[in-house]
């Protein structure tokens, strides 16, 4: 089974995201207070004349709130001691922000209420009651409300109970400067489409989670024999290709490899809508596969939509793309089980964008409180 395996280069700025180190405020002599921090990454070309857009994600904690009312902040007495659970809230794409440090400062103005509800499954509702002026043009801030799967954005949604009011307090913010053409996600109906007239091409990534040997994640994923964390497999639906006469002439395997080589696919990872896999085609895209890519040959796949548990693991640890493979399968489920998968390594791991740097923020730990941003100054 062909596998691409690349060595890590943590010294290269383009191959990592700066981690969120645990920094404690010790001015009052108390331990366990986290300072707010920012992580910045640039995906746009350094000398590009085009103005980039910014993707902003926040990571923090949900707290229970005293229902007696009143204005609160992260140091307010109406918040119950200790967080309920960790949380991620994506603000999505927005305009260029010239001074990224202003984003960190603006977190003090955030007031986000959290509520749990249910339809077909449990859902989390985030209401942005107070939005910093700097961030009002970002996607979520325009809508002022996010209704999403509770499993995707709350570390442990089962801890939220009826009869309580909850607020979300962001602690860490990730801002990614990127070209405008990265603002593209494949529509769900296209990803779910199956037919006996097409083959499905899938991408399997083996991600190395850079956790310690005593991490709880070691029980959830395969241990790496080299001792560098653990390994996780994640599959992504890349595209469909039409079954035609060329298959009979070339053979199924030769046809598959030829299509993969002609597309010249590259894969990378970045913090866009949370941890996101980016697939880019540098070559010819077959007509049947065109709906899976933007006009620039790009497709972004947020990991929380593909594998929520794996995405939440990356809130606290980094990862490396250890290997990448393309798999050809029958699209129709009735034919899928009766045919063997074809596997090839005709996909490149994009140089400089194969590592998702670990964060020292850990959703497995509780912290007493979070200091006001003024403590940073």
Swiss-Prot record:
Q: List GO molecular-function terms, semicolon-separated.
A: structural constituent of virion
Does Disulfide bond show up as a keyword for this record? Answer: no
Swiss-Prot/TrEMBL keywords: Viral envelope protein, Viral matrix protein, Virion
Where in the cell is the protein located?
Virion
The record's annotation in Pfam families points to:
Matrix_Paramyxo_C (PF23765), Matrix_Paramyxo_N (PF00661)
Q: Name one GO biological process term.
A: virion assembly
- InterPro entries per the UniProt record, alphabetical: Matrix_C, Matrix_N, Matrix_Paramyxo_C, Matrix_Paramyxo_N
Family affiliation: Belongs to the morbillivirus/respirovirus/rubulavirus M protein family.
Q: What protein name is recorded for this chain?
A: Matrix protein
